[in-house]
Regions:
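Conserved active-site alpha-helix within GNAT-family acetyltransferase domains
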Residues: 128, 140-158
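Conserved N-terminal entry element of GNAT/NAT acetyltransferase domains
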Residues: 1-26
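Conserved GNAT acetyl-CoA-binding A-motif
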Residues: 126-138
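Active-site rim helix/loop that mediates acceptor-substrate recognition in acyltransferases
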Residues: 37-65, 73
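C-terminal "cap" of GNAT-fold acetyltransferases
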Residues: 161-176
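Conserved acyl-donor/pantetheine-binding loop and adjacent beta-alpha core of acyl/acetyltransferases
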Residues: 70-102, 110
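Conserved beta-strand-loop-alpha-helix junction that forms the acyl-donor binding cleft
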Residues: 110, 136-146, 162
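Conserved acetyl-CoA-binding loop-helix of GNAT-fold acetyltransferases
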Residues: 102-105, 111-124, 151
Length: 176
């Protein structure tokens, strides 16, 4: 076994959703089980991803050989757990904003800077699609996510409590 693993980011083509999204959903489930608190992450369900993919979206992955070890999903849609648009909390134009829905990294591959690289790659792709802003959420106590988000230039807009979910809402301009 080689000690070197190619951690290049690749676009995930979704031609047959039930097959192509299965590794992403499986990875979400695996990652969710490794987190210290349930409220740190709420996996995106298949139906929700399909709905979000009706508009612009960016789905990226990193593979170790043929195994998906990290994934990132951003969509022109997306809402908070209360189903309100982010513009209820942040003063950005919704039609020029893309939601970075999730970044998930297999526990065995954490510490390689994948989350930050995904965030940077997603911003570049969103810019190519004509978007000017990105927004995302994280639990305030999920330190690795908060550090990656803030390290990628996102600014904290507000912290909200929605039912049992506490979320920091972040946003940033992605224009050059």
């Amino acid at each position: 076994m080689s000690l070197y693993v190619d951690l290049s980011i690749h676009k995930i083509e979704v031609v047959k959703p039930k097959i192509d999204l299965k590794p992403v959903l499986k990875l979400q489930e695996k990652v969710d089980k490794t987190l210290p608190k349930d409220e740190y992450y709420c996996p995106t369900e298949f139906d929700e991803m399909m709905e979000d993919m009706e508009g612009d979206y960016i789905l990226l992955g990193v593979y170790d050989r043929d195994k998906l070890i990290a994934a990132s999903f951003a969509t022109q849609y997306g809402s908070l757990p209360d189903f309100k648009p982010v513009t209820d909390y942040v003063d950005i134009p919704v039609e020029k904003s893309m939601n970075h829905e999730f970044v998930i990294v297999d526990m065995d591959y954490r510490g390689n800077g994948l989350q930050k690289r995904f965030m940077d790659a997603t911003m570049r792709e969103a810019r190519k699609l004509g978007y000017e802003y990105m927004w995302c959420c994280a639990h305030p106590d999920n330190t690795p996510s908060v550090c990656s988000i803030e390290g990628s230039g996102y600014k904290l807009a507000t912290t909200v409590q929605i039912n049992d979910w506490t979320r920091n809402i972040y946003y940033r301009s992605i224009t050059l």
